[in-house]
Amino acid sequence: MKQWVAVLLFVLPVAVRAQDQSSIVSFVNERTINAPIADLWRVWSTSEGYKAVGVTLADVDLRVGGLIRARYGADGTLGDAQTIENEILAFEPLRMIAIRIHKTPANFPFKEAWKQTWTVLTLTPLADGRTHVRAASLGYGTDAESVAMRRFFERGNEETLDRVAAHVERRESR
């Protein structure tokens, strides 16, 4: 028994440090959007809705293990070398979707850093009909490539939330 206690006393601080490290190298983008939760859920859960994030082509296979395939340029087709694929890790309808990059576009500059990352998008309905959107990006390392990729996605996620807000708020005003 004393041996197990000694092992746990050694292992637990290492596990806690690992958790602390992952929270240090992760980031969150948040926004309250003037639209009901159902409108925002459609953005991330349907092929047509996903185009609101700024892509030209999209295909969403909403299931655990399904892919969200997207292409920013109209000069190709889904599945070509410039398609980005995100794997759906988990989802709770109208509340949460967790994804990780499955395949990057051929010209994606961060060749290794993406392999350990994932994102959890959480939607929270507010009493006044608006929705709080929270995108937690996790698994980023401290190496130079990971730091650069983090900066890229911090800005990119803000721009995505801007586009989504403009899209759903425009629909609401009709």
Task: State the predicted function of each range.
Residues 16-59, 63:
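Hydrophobic ligand-binding cavity/cleft-lining segments
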Residues 40-41, 50, 68-70, 88, ...:
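Hydrophobic pocket/interface hotspot
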Residues 34-38, 62, 89-97, 122-132, ...:
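A short, structured loop/turn motif at beta-sheet edges
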